Amino acid sequence: MIPVVERRSPEETRACILQVAWELIRQLGARATIADVAERLGMSSANVYRFYPSKQALSEAVASSQLGAIIAEGRRLAAGPGSASERFGAVLVMMYHCMRDQMVNQSRVHEVVEIAMSERWPAIEAFKLDCCAIVADLVAEGQRRGEFGPGDPQYLAAQTLSACACIHHPQLIAQHGDTPTTLPPEAVVEFALRALTHPGPFPPNTGA
């Protein structure tokens, strides 16, 4: 049990509730309740409800927090050293590992991910938009540097993420897993980079 110290600020208490709720979701999945969180924290359920009016609100806040951490890491990698191509690859591979290790391989968490995606929680929709924005910025930078071909960066980012869905979409990762036919994330990234470098129609196959 993690007792809540009386002197904690509301922000610190809110963060504690989120942390414990995430731990319980990893253990119990969708069965985790407000009462479970309150018991773990040594609080009353009524006190937890002061911060989150429902189990749904708390679950969505946890999703927003976890996905927000992935976005923060994506932005850090996107702003790091190296070419736009290298940073694009780093962002996509990071997303793959986060989704596989945190959202798919932990079965209880995956239960909640499935619910969140089927119900189109706002956190999921915000995550998609943020991912697209990160990739669009990298595409625009790559175009300025001559790494990528012409085209609207936002459109190219959306199409690229769709083409790479098998390495960042939790449901697709769960379906395919580590089967022999599954491409490693690096191979998918390489394919996407070739398309960004030559965004026009592919030349006909000459059989060479």
Q: What would you call each of these model-derived segments?
A:
Residues 87, 99-119, 169-173:
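Amphipathic alpha-helical segments used for helix-helix packing
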Residues 1-40, 57-60:
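Basic, helix-initiating cap at the start of DNA-binding domains
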Residues 25, 33-34, 45, 55, ...:
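Amphipathic alpha-helical segments enriched in hydrophobic/aromatic and basic residues
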Residues 68-71, 118-145, 154-158:
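Amphipathic alpha-helical packing segments from all-alpha helical-bundle domains
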Residues 61, 75-104, 156-160:
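Hydrophobic alpha-helical connector segments
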Residues 29-30, 50, 145-148:
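Helix-turn-helix/winged-helix DNA-binding modules
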Residues 42-52:
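Short hydrophobic/aromatic patch on the recognition helix
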Residues 1-4, 90, 129-145, 162-208:
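C-terminal peripheral helix-coil segments that are non-catalytic and often amphipathic
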